[in-house]
Curated annotation (Swiss-Prot):
Gene Ontology CC annotation, any one: cytosol
Protein name as annotated: Ribosomal protein uS12 methylthiotransferase RimO
EC numbers on record: 2.8.4.4
Cofactor annotation: [4Fe-4S] cluster
Classification of source organism: Bacteria, Bacillati, Cyanobacteriota, Cyanophyceae, Nostocales
Start and end residues of each TRAM domain: 372-438
Main function: Catalyzes the methylthiolation of an aspartic acid residue of ribosomal protein uS12.
Protein's gene: rimO
Cofactor binding note: Binds 2 [4Fe-4S] clusters. One cluster is coordinated with 3 cysteines and an exchangeable S-adenosyl-L-methionine.
Gene Ontology terms, MF aspect: 4 iron, 4 sulfur cluster binding; aspartic acid methylthiotransferase activity; metal ion binding; protein methylthiotransferase activity
Chain ranges of the Radical SAM core domain: 140-369
Binding-site positions, [4Fe-4S] cluster 2: 154, 158, 161
Reactions the enzyme catalyzes: L-aspartate(89)-[ribosomal protein uS12]-hydrogen + (sulfur carrier)-SH + AH2 + 2 S-adenosyl-L-methionine = 3-methylsulfanyl-L-aspartate(89)-[ribosomal protein uS12]-hydrogen + (sulfur carrier)-H + 5'-deoxyadenosine + L-methionine + A + S-adenosyl-L-homocysteine + 2 H(+)
Tagged with keyword Iron: yes
Amino acid sequence: MGDKPTIAISHLGCEKNRIDTEHMLGMLVEAGYGVDTNEELADYVIVNTCSFIEAARQESVRTLVELAEANKKIVITGCMAQHFQEQLLEELPEAVAVVGTGDYHKIVNVIERVELGERVKQVSIEPTYIADETTPRYRTTTEGVAYLRVAEGCDYRCAFCIIPHLRGNQRSRTIESIVAEAEQLVSQGVKEIILISQITTNYGLDIYGKPKLAELLRALGKVDIPWIRMHYAYPTGLTPDAIAAIQETPNVLPYLDLPLQHSHPDILRAMNRPWQGRVNDGIIDRIKTALPTAVLRTTFIVGFPGETQEHFEHLLEFVQRHEFDHVGVFTFSSEEGTPAYKLPNQLAQEVMDDRRYQLMELQQPISQKKNQQEVGKIVDVLIEQENPESGELIGRSGRFSPEVDGLVYVKGQAKLGTIVPVAIHHADTYDLYGQVVNN
């Protein structure tokens, strides 16, 4: 035990990457390795990288260069390792191993081989692995919240997206496996489970022959957990049955993360999402009718090649009309290896930046209005942090997802990791403010 090296993990990227990080930590701890939060003291640093867009790659490269300059032994995992395996080994002598997105479960074996002097390249050409409830896991989120992956990979081929190349085709877990992991998380004190995959509404299509999201939600409804939240609902997959399951299952929050990407049919066709333009409005209206309290989050890409001022104004009008609760806006990032990389009529970065600014400026008063509607209500809040200086508590209500949405700043007494009633007395564009209601 004592002679095994210590390992630190630097986590970058999305919550799917976070789950991979947590499984690697779990496997290393189970194998007797010491895990150190201090990268300077650790013998090895695993950098779980992101390669989704250029900005994410730059952050990953900065982290790798800083560690290389500090002469750390680096194990590179994640999407960048899958994407640029040869290049990374050539350019970073300090990299002792690269491990692909479908190979992180071999991390203990990789470290053992490195310890014997091998420089390891463990990258499957086509990632096929998916962890389940039997895979060790060491959670890194706050005590009350956990991500639960229902599927990995993606069968869609949106023109701007490199994810299928980096994470493979969709592979779903069984309903039984997901429910078993949910039960494990409840036993650890988790109060909120966030279901994730690339397209959660396509869950089960590969193993059951048709999407089974509705059945999954109903099965999770029998688990003793207060909040179940769903990320990444592809709009065309929100069938009447899926919406009914959200309606009927009390612990499933009426929170829908719909990555719409654009509103105009021309741009959606160019994005290789041709069917979406016909259904955007109808699905949003159907959700609002069936789930009047639904919280809607979406993301848009501005500056996709060929986006004219007319296309952009269509998007502005769409956002103004539908009044989403939360909106994320990205400028188009031209990714080598995607169809969009070679499209004509690429827009200048300053035009894209200006459009992003305009769309965010349009959304801010809408977000403010939506938050303002919470003032005067008593809402359940999951308490996650305490400010040691002021004693103020920080948490989230059901309308806020971790990291991407706002927070609730709370006065009063409550234990971390518990859900308590809070009277909301103030709101701003992104956050809410309130007082614990003592029974």
